Amino acid sequence: MTKIPDNIRQDAFKYVMENKPNELFELIAMNPGLINERSQGNQDTLFMRACRYLHKDIIEILLNEQANPTDINNHGNNAIMCLFYREDQHKKPKDINEHDEKAVAILKLFEEKNIPINCFTGQDADKDTPLIEAARAALPQSISFMLDYLEKKSLLRRSIITYK
């Protein structure tokens, strides 16, 4: 596998952050190995970063290019966990609601593409789960979606029975 030059990797992460799907797509087309590149800091993938920034268009591009939605970073966080991180914990209710709506839209995309939504099995280094992160971020629609998803998959009932 060819090593991706640092400047190209950095451009890719910049395009994800700035929500520039066309530029990212072109860069990936010229550098297919870029899809698996990780950030130098915490080893996030482009897919994780797209989830963190709630950039659904970029998430779709990355999935179409075979990004691995189950990768984890150095902290044990997966892409679903990244959906619920809010950079600014002092957001106004309107901003929180917008964050919640975008996160749910991405969760629905995952469900449509049969990407497992591991709400309380995917734990990070602190033993937090996506469901805990969504609650911590005060994202009620995301919590409701995940609980409904678990119920649909009969995972909630099995988990509760197993826990007893």
UniProtKB/Swiss-Prot annotation:
ANK repeats lie at residues 42-107, 126-149. InterPro entries: Ankyrin_rpt, Ankyrin_rpt-contain_sf. Gene3D superfamilies: Ankyrin repeat-containing domain. Keywords: ANK repeat, Repeat. This is Putative ankyrin repeat protein RBE_0585. It comes from Rickettsia bellii (strain RML369-C).
